[in-house]
């Protein structure tokens, strides 16, 4: 067991694993607990560290040691392209620069105002998805799939949401057509990410626009910025500024 928000814990856990890993599913994440915008010892917000930072350390260590067999799957979220009906704005940036993306990681994006935790979650997922697309271009011999499990009932994911949205997620959305599906459906999406050879490396798959269930589709048609290679590279750079400077082994 290790804490995906703590790079040192991830490295220690990986040292205990022998051999290669045929398929890696990076599903840990969430809304950052009770203090999502507080900073970890590494200088990242808890919500970013929980959703992205440890996964970066884990996957890139496996790649560096040539221990990833074939495929890595990162659990994305429709929040990365916006969920207006649930109060998640689509992430957007003024410059798309590494400097600007780095402000998401350290929380200074919201300096001088009240943080929007829903937006911060979508931003974190988006940066993780862009990083995976960057890796897909660097490692064409392996598959890097981003897959949202969709709005899945029966998990602990809503526990960190604000009370009104938490109550809606637990008791209202499961009864509204088009807003959620059962746990086994969400789990199957992640399994498909590992096993379905028709899924394209570097692509983010999630529910169609304006829904949170149903078939998983390529999100690039909904949010073209996902295919922006410069933005992908800037996301990778922003992440590694923190990892290189603040997370020694």
For the regions a language model picked out, list residue spans one by one.
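Rossmann-fold NAD(P)H-dependent dehydrogenase/reductase core
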Residues: 1-153, 244-248
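Alpha-helical membrane-targeting segments
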Residues: 109-116, 151-185
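Short aromatic-enriched loop/helix-cap "lid" or pocket-rim segments at secondary-structure transitions
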Residues: 84-88, 156-161, 216-220
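C-terminal helical subdomain
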Residues: 171-220, 229-230, 237-245
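Short, flexible, mixed-charge acidic loops at enzyme active sites
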Residues: 88-91, 159-166, 209-210
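A structural signal for well-ordered alpha-helical segments within the folded catalytic domains
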Residues: 53-56, 126-130, 184-188, 233, ...
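Short C-terminal domain-edge/linker segments immediately following a structured domain
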Residues: 54-57, 102-108, 174-181, 235-238
């Amino acid at each position: 067991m290790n804490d995906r928000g703590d790079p040192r814990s991830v490295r220690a856990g990986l040292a205990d694993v022998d051999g290669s890993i045929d398929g890696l599913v990076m599903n840990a994440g969430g809304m950052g607990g009770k203090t999502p915008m507080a900073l970890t010892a590494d200088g990242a917000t808890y919500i970013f560290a929980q959703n992205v930072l440890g996964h970066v350390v884990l996957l890139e260590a496996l790649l560096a040691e040539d221990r990833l067999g074939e495929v890595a799957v990162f659990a994305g979220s429709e929040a990365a392209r916006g969920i207006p009906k649930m109060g998640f704005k689509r992430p957007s940036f003024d410059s798309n620069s590494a400097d600007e993306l780095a402000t998401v990681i350290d929380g200074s994006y919201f300096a001088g105002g009240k943080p929007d935790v829903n937006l911060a979650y979508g931003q974190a997922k988006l940066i993780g998805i862009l990083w995976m697309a960057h890796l897909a271009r660097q490692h064409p011999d392996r598959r890097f799939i981003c897959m949202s499990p969709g709005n899945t009932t029966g998990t602990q994911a809503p526990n960190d949401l604000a009370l009104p949205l938490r109550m809606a997620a637990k008791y209202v959305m499961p009864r509204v057509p088009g807003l959620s599906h059962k746990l086994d459906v969400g789990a199957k999406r992640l399994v498909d990410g590992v096993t379905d050879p028709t899924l394209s490396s570097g692509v983010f798959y999630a529910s169609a626009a304006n829904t949170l269930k149903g078939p998983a589709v390529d999100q690039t048609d909904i949010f073209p910025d996902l295919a922006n290679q410069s933005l992908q590279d800037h996301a990778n750079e922003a992440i590694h500024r923190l990892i290189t400077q603040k997370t020694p082994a």
